[in-house]
UniProtKB/Swiss-Prot annotation:
Enzyme class: transferase
Pathway assigned in UniProt: tRNA modification; N(7)-methylguanine-tRNA biosynthesis
Residues that bind S-adenosyl-L-methionine: E54, E79, E106, D129
Keyword annotations: Methyltransferase, S-adenosyl-L-methionine, Transferase, tRNA processing
Annotated catalysed reactions: guanosine(46) in tRNA + S-adenosyl-L-methionine = N(7)-methylguanosine(46) in tRNA + S-adenosyl-L-homocysteine
Gene that this sequence comes from: trmB
HAMAP family in UniProt: tRNA_methyltr_TrmB (MF_01057)
Binding site for substrate: K133, D165
Entry-linked Pfam families: Methyltransf_4
Protein name: tRNA (guanine-N(7)-)-methyltransferase
Domain of life: Bacteria
Family indicated by similarity: Belongs to the class I-like SAM-binding methyltransferase superfamily. TrmB family.
Active-site residues, as the UniProt record annotates them: D129
InterPro entries referenced in this protein's UniProt entry, alphabetically: SAM-dependent_MTases_sf (IPR029063), tRNA_(Gua-N-7)_MeTrfase_Trmb (IPR003358), tRNA_methyltr_TrmB_bact (IPR055361)
Length: 224
């Protein structure tokens, strides 16, 4: 299957939440999110295995590799750009991956309206846009409200991982996560990832430019 074989299932004026071809479409600026009844993960994946979630999935190289590596774990790939969703879907289809659901939409909207408490064993955020300019800071993913939402959907003992090439974004995000989660690494709470992290297109891009790759991990405290 080619990326262009996946067609958007509605025109903008007819947009609505919809699951089709292993893609969950979560449109922007939609006033009736709550009218869509989200199936359980067990129904979506046809099993009761653990569910992990990748945010900022890009072209899908990393998450498809993870899904193929261990088919007992279910994965959700969240990517807001439809051109990238198409590429993830193409890889998923060609590799016959059955333990992956793609979410086409904003992570915040998906979590707020469709992810119940204690849903995920792990959340991995790979190379999010750092929005480095101060006037764009409201767009940054690692802000208090959304970090609290990520904590909400993690199981007790669940893990939140951030991988980025932007050191300033890394340290700012760590300061936010320290308010709600326990660090999984010793101070300064991150490592420089020297080995191949898993075939991410963005990892390959930044390494080709000589950039360092940083990783931090946090764990949900019992009782949160």
């Amino acid at each position: 299957m080619k990326p262009q074989d996946l067609k958007l299932p509605y025109f903008w004026e007819d947009r609505c939440p919809k699951i089709e071809n292993h893609v969950f479409y979560v449109p922007s600026y939609y006033p009736k999110y709550e009218e869509f009844v989200m199936p359980s993960w067990q129904n979506l994946f046809a099993n009761e295995g653990p569910v992990c979630c990748e945010l900022c999935s890009g072209n899908g190289d990393w998450v498809v590799e993870q899904a193929l590596k261990d088919t007992s774990i279910n994965w959700i790939a969240v990517e807001k750009r439809f051109d990238r969703v198409r590429k993830i879907w193409s890889k998923m289809s060609n590799h016959k991956v059955n333990n992956l659901l793609i979410v086409c939409g904003e992570a915040q909207t998906f979590f707020t309206h469709y992810v119940t408490d204690a849903s995920f064993q792990k959340i991995v955020v790979n190379f999010p846009d750092p929005w480095p300019k101060f006037r764009h800071r409201k767009h940054r993913l690692f802000q208090d409200v959304f970090v609290q939402d990520m904590v909400r959907v993690l199981v007790e003992g669940g893990q939140l991982t951030l991988v980025t090439d932007d050191h300033t974004y890394l340290t700012n995000s760590i300061q936010v996560m320290l308010n709600y989660l326990s660090p999984g690494m010793q101070d300064p709470y991150y490592v420089n990832v020297k080995d191949n992290y898993g075939g991410s297109w963005f990892e390959n891009l930044w390494r080709s430019k000589g950039e360092k790759i940083f990783c931090t991990e946090f764990v949900k405290r019992v009782g949160i």
